[in-house]
Amino acid sequence: MKKHNFNAGPSILPREVIEDTAKAILDFNGSGLSLMEISHRAKDFQPVVDEAEALFKELLNIPEGYSVLFLGGGASMEFCMVPFNFLEKKAAYLNTGVWAKKAMKEAKGFGEVVEVASSAEATYTYIPKDYTIPADADYFHITTNNTIYGTELKEDLNSPVPMVADMSSDIFSRPIDVSKYICIYGGAQKNLAPAGVTFVIVKNDAVGKVSRYIPSMLNYQTHIDNGSMFNTPPVVPIYAALLNLRWIKAQGGVKEMERRAIEKADMLYAEIDRNKLFVGTAAKEDRSRMNICFVMAPEYKDLEADFMKFATEKGMVGIKGHRSVGGFRASCYNALPKESVQALIDCMQEFEKLH
């Protein structure tokens, strides 16, 4: 039976990316060595990093004056590195969920943090719209997609101060005006690669402005100067990221990824809104294209476990909602085919007929 992978992360990757990574793990570039055992400074590996950086810049149309870094530590490390490198006195944060809240917590150790708005009172089911960003803030931090609650900023915001964005779960799903940001970061295990590598897009002239000492490993300048090679990088995930970037380009680039994301999300939301058994949880104008969250309608709440069992038997994987909110979550990242979305819709319709 075919499995349909809706996991929120680590998540689905294109089949050819998995297969080609597996080949390299056995024999990298005909070297007779596994990708897992070559030196990161081997002559065959530097071109991997160089091409991955070049494709990042090409696919996202990154302007001159920015560096692309491949680091460790996940987005959680960036919650600390961002204020370490950019927060001199004050930073503004938009609180749209758990990950934004965690980023705010780390920033408070480095200076004043202004929460410009929050949707916590509504369990983060919408993204705040009316707020004022302090003009004297060093930066304004946003989390563009909220995987737990299924909300998403689908366009770049306007800000009177430089922006920083956690784009862990929607990078490469839509075009971005990178010039609006001094830093974009994310864990790779949603739309880019297996877990283990963290991407950072950083504006070079924004680094080095704070007065504090920054340990070498936490200083963006260190990694800019060393081309992501200051310490041993996560070789296998970087190689898988390169293969995935090639795949995105071959499929038609970020605009095509956006078209597919809209199509898949529209299909599934239409079924949620039509089906008597299910209710969407996010405000309609803020619904995420990446993480589609829904619950049983109140009068059918007792069928939740039955539907989970039914869907699992039909090959649906990873649709259980986050433990903090419950219900269901279908993550529709770039590599998820439309056929999987249709299979979930068919499953929902079949279950509806039974009840």
UniProtKB/Swiss-Prot annotation:
Gene3D superfamilies in alphabetical order: Aspartate Aminotransferase, domain 1, Type I PLP-dependent aspartate aminotransferase-like (Major domain)
Annotated positions binding pyridoxal 5'-phosphate: A75, S76, W99, T147, D166, Q189, N231, T232
Top-level taxon: Bacteria
Xref: SUPFAM superfamilies: PLP-dependent transferases
Catalysed reaction equations from the record: O-phospho-L-serine + 2-oxoglutarate = 3-phosphooxypyruvate + L-glutamate; 4-(phosphooxy)-L-threonine + 2-oxoglutarate = (R)-3-hydroxy-2-oxo-4-phosphooxybutanoate + L-glutamate
Compartments (UniProt record): Cytoplasm
InterPro entries: Aminotrans_V_dom (IPR000192), Pser_aminoTfrase (IPR022278), PyrdxlP-dep_Trfase (IPR015424), PyrdxlP-dep_Trfase_major (IPR015421), PyrdxlP-dep_Trfase_small (IPR015422)
One of the protein's GO biological processes: pyridoxine biosynthetic process
Enzyme nomenclature, EC number: 2.6.1.52
Keyword Transferase recorded: yes
Record GO cellular component, one term: cytoplasm
Biological pathway: Amino-acid biosynthesis; L-serine biosynthesis; L-serine from 3-phospho-D-glycerate: step 2/3; Cofactor biosynthesis; pyridoxine 5'-phosphate biosynthesis; pyridoxine 5'-phosphate from D-erythrose 4-phosphate: step 3/5
Keywords: Amino-acid biosynthesis, Aminotransferase, Cytoplasm, Pyridoxal phosphate, Pyridoxine biosynthesis, Serine biosynthesis, Transferase
Details of cofactor binding: Binds 1 pyridoxal phosphate per subunit.
Signal peptide range in chain numbering: none
In-chain residues carrying the UniProt-annotated modification N6-(pyridoxal phosphate)lysine: K190
Gene Ontology terms, MF aspect: O-phospho-L-serine:2-oxoglutarate aminotransferase activity; pyridoxal phosphate binding
Major site of localization recorded for this protein: cytoplasm
Binding positions (L-glutamate): R41
Cofactors demanded by this protein: pyridoxal 5'-phosphate
NCBIfam families xrefs: PRK05355.1, serC_1
Family as reported in the entry's similarity comment: Belongs to the class-V pyridoxal-phosphate-dependent aminotransferase family. SerC subfamily.
Function: Catalyzes the reversible conversion of 3-phosphohydroxypyruvate to phosphoserine and of 3-hydroxy-2-oxo-4-phosphonooxybutanoate to phosphohydroxythreonine.
Oligomer and partners: Homodimer.
The name this protein goes by in its record: Phosphoserine aminotransferase
